[in-house]
């Protein structure tokens, strides 16, 4: 039908229709291409959370906490400061150190995470990571990286590392080579001083150095999806005795926080601020 109609048209009208049709088709193709080229983005302001303490546990006041992680029901901790840095397995109920490896005095211990039968610990300015046997704490190997080492966590396929800036780095868990990087932001503002990390149900929880709050980060986009306000959880005495240390126990769906040289470790529950 349309073909018969086109046959009886004059040349000028036919040319005009063909040009318009070509423009519409091209525009449609361009729109499709633009749709596929744009990455999904987060929308809306971050959700605000408050907390309540479920239970309080003792914590070693000589533990300058830099990393905290649960694995198979056991709590592991990395402590910092030159000459005092350590890897520990800690009894949650009474805070006693059940097992410990002291780092050589030239290393400042930092972020910590677990992968299968191994523990991975960062150092601060030395730019070296150590891999340990989870059971014996025997050293299995080491690796290097180009930035400072602050926080470390594992999302099931990649290590995620912070360096005190607004960046998160993704590392291959076998080769420890960097495979990706994102910048963390709240709206358009970068979020800096990102410290200890914990992967919780598809998001990254991050301590922010010298702030009593935790950022909840979308690890695909770097967008801050939420803030947990921990104001008043503990009044520290020293300028460096700040909130640092997040551990999530998947087996019990429990969240724990502590700080550097704090006397307590807290199990907390969070709720949306009204």
Q: Where are the predicted features?
A:
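Surface loop/turn motifs at the tips and blade-to-blade linkers of beta-strand repeat domains
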Residues: 56-61, 100-105, 141-147, 182-189, ...
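Signature of short aromatic-glycine-proline-rich micro-motifs recurring in repeat-based ectodomains
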Residues: 65, 194, 239-247
């Amino acid at each position: 039908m349309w073909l018969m109609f086109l046959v009886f048209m004059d040349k000028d009208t036919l040319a005009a229709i063909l040009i318009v049709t070509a423009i519409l088709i091209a525009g449609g193709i361009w729109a499709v291409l633009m749709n596929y080229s744009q990455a999904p983005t987060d929308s809306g302001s971050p959700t605000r959370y408050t907390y309540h303490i479920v239970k309080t546990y003792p914590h070693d006041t000589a533990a300058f906490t830099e990393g905290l992680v649960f694995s198979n029901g056991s709590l592991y901790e990395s402590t910092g400061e030159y000459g005092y840095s350590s890897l520990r397995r800690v009894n949650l109920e009474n805070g006693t150190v059940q097992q410990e490896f002291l780092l050589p005095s030239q290393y400042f211990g930092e972020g910590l995470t677990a992968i299968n039968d191994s523990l991975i610990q960062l150092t601060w300015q030395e730019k070296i990571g150590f891999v340990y046997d989870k059971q014996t704490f025997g050293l299995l190997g080491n690796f290097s990286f180009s930035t400072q080492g602050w926080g470390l966590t594992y999302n099931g396929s990649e290590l995620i590392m912070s360096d005190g800036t607004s960046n998160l780095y993704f590392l291959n868990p076998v080769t420890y080579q960097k495979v990706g990087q994102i910048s963390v932001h709240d709206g358009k503002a970068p979020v800096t001083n990102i410290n200890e990390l914990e992967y919780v149900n598809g998001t990254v929880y991050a301590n922010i150095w010298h702030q009593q709050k935790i950022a909840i980060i979308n690890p695909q986009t770097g967008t801050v999806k939420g803030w947990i306000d921990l104001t008043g959880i503990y009044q520290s005495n020293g300028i460096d005795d700040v909130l640092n240390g997040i551990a999530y126990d998947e087996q019990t769906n429990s969240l724990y926080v502590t700080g550097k040289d704090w006397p307590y470790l807290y199990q907390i529950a969070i709720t949306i601020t009204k």
